[in-house]
Amino acid sequence: MVMNVRVLTPTRVICSTTADEVILPGLTGLVGILDGHAALITALDTGLLRIKLNEKWTPIILCGGLAEIDRNRVTVLVNDVEELVAVELNEATTELEKATLAVENAETSKARLDASIELKKAVARLEGMNYLS
């Protein structure tokens, strides 16, 4: 049996589909969701959402939010999403290195927080490249 999955931002529906499996970027690590999962509401971190249907994975970069799992329905409410585009591995690696340096060189708490969010996005982009081929 498949699950119904919806990914929503405050301004639009990103996707509404079915899935065999969903992997969410939780605050304390990845959360795997299969058919019949116990009811759950969980906070989401910036990272890569993975939706699997018929042995094909669809990646979506999330920018924080929450997810509600209820029977065979997964609703993901996020602040924003980032389009995952095919880029060269060198470019993605360079972005990751720049983001890492920005975190290390941040002089204020706000700058460090902003840089850490960009670092999480860079990691998600690099991870997401595995699903684009």
Swiss-Prot record:
GO terms for molecular function: ATP binding; proton-transporting ATP synthase activity, rotational mechanism. InterPro entries: ATP_synth_F1_dsu/esu, ATP_synth_F1_dsu/esu_N, ATPsynth_dsu/esu_N. Keywords: ATP synthesis, CF(1), Chloroplast, Hydrogen ion transport, Ion transport, Membrane, Plastid, Thylakoid, Transport. It is found in: Plastid, Chloroplast thylakoid membrane. It is a peripheral membrane protein. GO terms for cellular component: chloroplast thylakoid membrane; proton-transporting ATP synthase complex. Signal peptide: none annotated. Pfam families: ATP-synt_DE_N (PF02823). F-type ATPases have 2 components, CF(1) - the catalytic core - and CF(0) - the membrane proton channel. CF(1) has five subunits: alpha(3), beta(3), gamma(1), delta(1), epsilon(1). CF(0) has three main subunits: a, b and c. Belongs to the ATPase epsilon chain family. This is ATP synthase epsilon chain, chloroplastic.
